[in-house]
Each structure stands twice: as C-alpha cells, then as structure tokens.
C-alpha cells in the first residue's frame, strides 16, 4: 500500500512537471511579432527612398542644336531664345511646355560660311538680355562672311545665372550683315545648354 501511495505522488509530480514544461514553451510564440517589426521598418525606409524622385527640384540639363539657314550678305534679324525660339521647336514647343522654369547656361554660335572667297563683308551679332531691341546697336562681335568661325557665350553674357519662367524669353541675339548684295553668306549653327526645373 505504501509503495502504491508513493507512486501516486510521483505521477502527480511528473504531470506537474509536464504542465510546467508546456507552459515554458508557450512564450516562444511571442517572439514572432518582433521579427515582423524590422520588416515593417525596412519597408518604410524603402518607401522613403522610392519617394525621392518625386521631390527632385530640377529636371537636369539638355543640349539643343539648331540652325538659322539661308543667310545673305545683307541679312538682318533677331533670334529669340526662349518660348519664342521658332527655329528650335524641340525647345519652344517641346521641353519648355513640360517645365515651369529654365535657364540657358551657354551657347555656341558658329557661322558656317557658304559664300565664295570673293564675297565681301561681315555679319555682326549682339546679345540683348532685356529683350527689347528692334535693331542691332553694337558691332563688337562679328564674323567674316567668307570664313567659318565660332563664338561661345557663357551664362554671364546671356542672363543665364538664374532660373526664370518658361513663358518668357531669356535673351535675344540680333544679327546684321553689312554686304550690299543678296549673295549667299551662310548659316548659323547654334548649340545651347538648357537647365530645367519644376516639371509641370
């Protein structure tokens, strides 16, 4: 009887030990939410990184090349750099309609001569950053009609340091040839760098 009585408590103790062991296993499940936490944090970091392009203030820089053709030995006119630049539809009717602000930071003006060696005269150019002149007023910058040459103008000379609205011209380039005939002179080939900001 005594031996049977001893066996009874042992079973009870063993059952109690099993219950305690079962209880100690349950808290392991609590660890799983902690594993999910870093995933959510990492997800948020990725979200912030992916949103950066939306807030980019600039649209980068584009390079445009266009020409003004059929210049004569007595030609004159104005090239209006900005939304009025009809000679370069890719700028005036294209990219400027996609951005609120722009600035032309440099231009390279090449006069490519198509004149004969005997054609006399020169073609003069002037930059008008006020966009008001109707005729050439300065004869400092010039090209000999019978020779190909190029000139480069940086931001300081073309009002290109600050961004401005894409609805207004940045500057004009007036030109005038001093020849007395309508002989073929050549063409302007103009390369310009344009910075863009704030997409529409």
From Swiss-Prot:
GO terms for cellular component: T=3 icosahedral viral capsid. Residues 1-54 are annotated as: Disordered. Residues 26-36 have a biased composition (Low complexity). GO terms for molecular function: structural molecule activity. Keywords: Capsid protein, T=3 icosahedral capsid protein, Virion. Its main location: virion. It comes from the Viruses. Residues 37-48 have a biased composition (Basic residues). It is found in: Virion. The keyword Coiled coil does not apply. The N-terminal region like those of many plant virus capsid proteins is highly basic. It has been suggested that these regions may be involved in protein-RNA interaction. Major capsid protein. Belongs to the luteoviruses capsid protein family. This is Major capsid protein. It comes from Barley yellow dwarf virus (isolate P-PAV) (BYDV). The lineage of its organism: Viruses, Riboviria, Orthornavirae, Kitrinoviricota, Tolucaviricetes.
């Amino acid at each position: 009887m005594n031996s049977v009585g001893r066996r009874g408590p042992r079973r009870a103790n063993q059952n109690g030990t099993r219950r305690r062991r079962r209880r100690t296993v349950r808290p392991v499940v609590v660890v799983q939410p902690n594993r999910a936490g870093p995933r959510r944090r990492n997800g948020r970091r990725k979200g912030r990184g992916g949103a950066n392009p939306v807030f980019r203030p600039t649209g980068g820089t584009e390079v445009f090349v266009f020409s003004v053709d059929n210049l004569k030995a007595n030609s004159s006119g104005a090239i209006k750099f900005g939304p009025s630049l009809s000679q370069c539809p890719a700028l005036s009717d294209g990219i400027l309609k996609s951005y609120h602000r722009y600035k032309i930071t440099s231009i390279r003006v090449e006069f490519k001569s198509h004149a004969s060696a005997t054609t006399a005269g020169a073609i003069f150019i002037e930059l008008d950053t006020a966009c008001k002149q109707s005729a050439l007023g300065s004869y400092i910058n010039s090209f000999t009609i019978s020779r190909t040459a190029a000139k480069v103008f940086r931001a300081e000379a073309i009002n290109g340091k600050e961004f401005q609205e894409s609805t207004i011209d940045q500057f004009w380039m007036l030109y005038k040839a001093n020849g007395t005939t309508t002989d073929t002179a050549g063409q302007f080939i103009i390369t310009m760098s344009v910075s863009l900001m704030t997409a529409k």
